[in-house]
Amino acid sequence: MNRKVAVRETMLEYAGDPFAWGVLDCCQFAAKVAEKITGTDFSKGFFYASEDDAEGIINSANGLENLVTKILGVDSVGVEFLDVGDPVLVDIPVMGNMIGVFNGNHAIIKLKKRAVLIEGQRILKGWHLG
């Protein structure tokens, strides 16, 4: 699927859905976009229902970056190597690191109240889906 269409369709499909750990959180939103692009469900096999559960999975992988690298099976790269729809690691003040979706200039992140657009300079790195 076209990457821009994948991001737009995922945004529209889940725009009104509430945040839910393990169902529609920052990582699950990025996984839904990645599945539209690649046809692979990267969230398969990861079950959690709370922030504590999610933190446990992240900690057992020695951090969010390591977890995503393991799940995707590719190393992280700099922003200059990313395409629209690629998952990104974003530093958000007060909240810490989160996973978002690259839209070409910004990151789209599903937060508890809504999806937000985060300026590109907050993107630490990402994973090119190929």
What do the PLM-derived regions correspond to, one by one?
Residues 1-59:
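N-terminal capping segments
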Residues 23-26, 31-33, 94, 100-102, ...:
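Generic alpha-helix signal with a bias toward terminal, lower-confidence helices
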Residues 36-38, 59, 105-107, 124-126:
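General N-terminal targeting signals
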Residues 52-117:
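...with weaker cross-activation on analogous glycine-rich loops/strands in unrelated enzymes
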Residues 116-130:
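Glycine- and charge-enriched low-complexity intrinsically disordered segments
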